[in-house]
Every structure is written in structure tokens, then in C-alpha cells.
């Protein structure tokens, strides 16, 4: 393989060779699927998204939702989707993600709204799902 680089994949348990510029998603596709999909990977101990391309020899460890880093990736992604949906449905209002409510989620406020109804919550959830095409 011309211009190939060595990737030490902790998830695989050994090294593999890939072409320069290979995205992490392609490396992940070589792995036996686990119970949960991979959300990101540590590349030389730094968290990277799956479209990150590899150009030098690296050590990779993929993470899923069972890993603390995977939970954080999932949370941040959910926050971006929530922000996008809130801006679309409630223009002129600012969504604030205030603090953690333990394993129940996060406390949020929409600035400028005195009341947030069940119908508005359902519309927000529906728009979030449409953004990710579910």
C-alpha cells in the first residue's frame, strides 16, 4: 500500500496499515461491530470526531456511549441539535443550558418565554428528531 501509515488500534488489539488521509470512520468499519456504535475516538490521547483524517502514525482507541468520553460527545451533540431546533421554533428567544440534573438530564431555560407548554416541548422534540432524520 503506497503512502500507508501504521495505526495502532487499541480496540483491535494490534497495528493495522491504512492509506494516508484515511478517516477514522473507515478504520472503525474494519472493526467487528460492538453492541453500540462508535461516537468518536482518542487519537494519541486526544478526542477526535470520526471524520478526522489520519496522516501520521497514531494510536487510536474508539469510544461508544458506554465510555465517559462517549457520553460527553453524545451530550454535546444533543445540545447543538437542541440549540438549532430552539432557534428555528422560537426565534428571538435564547436557549440557556443551565446545569446538570444528575442522570435525568439538564435544566434549560428559553429566555423571554414565561411558560413552556407540553405542546411546545413536543414540537421541540419533533424538530430535533427531524434534524437527525429519525
Give residue ranges: language-model regions.
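Ubiquitin-like/PB1-type beta-grasp interaction modules and other compact soluble beta-rich domains
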Residues: 1-79, 84, 88-105, 123-127
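Conserved, charged catalytic cores of large soluble enzymes
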Residues: 111
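Glycine- and Gly-Pro-enriched alpha-helical subdomains that act as flexible
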Residues: 116-120
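Conserved small/polar residues in nucleotide/adenosyl-binding loops
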Residues: 132-134
Amino acid at each position: 500500500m503506497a503512502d500507508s501509515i501504521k495505526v495502532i488500534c487499541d480496540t483491535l488489539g494490534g497495528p493495522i496499515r491504512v492509506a494516508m488521509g484515511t478517516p477514522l470512520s473507515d478504520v472503525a468499519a474494519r472493526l467487528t461491530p460492538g453492541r453500540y456504535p462508535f461516537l468518536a475516538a482518542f487519537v494519541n490521547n486526544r478526542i477526535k470526531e470520526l471524520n478526522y483524517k489520519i496522516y501520521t502514525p497514531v494510536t487510536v482507541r474508539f469510544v461508544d456511549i458506554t465510555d465517559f468520553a462517549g457520553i460527553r460527545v453524545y451530550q454535546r451533540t444533543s445540545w447543538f441539535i437542541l440549540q438549532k431546533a430552539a432557534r428555528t421554533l422560537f426565534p428571538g428567544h435564547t436557549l440557556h443550558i443551565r446545569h446538570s440534573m444528575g442522570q435525568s438530564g439538564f435544566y434549560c431555560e428559553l429566555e423571554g418565554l414565561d411558560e413552556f407548554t407540553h405542546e411546545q416541548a413536543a414540537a421541540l422534540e419533533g424538530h430535533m428528531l427531524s434534524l437527525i432524520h429519525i
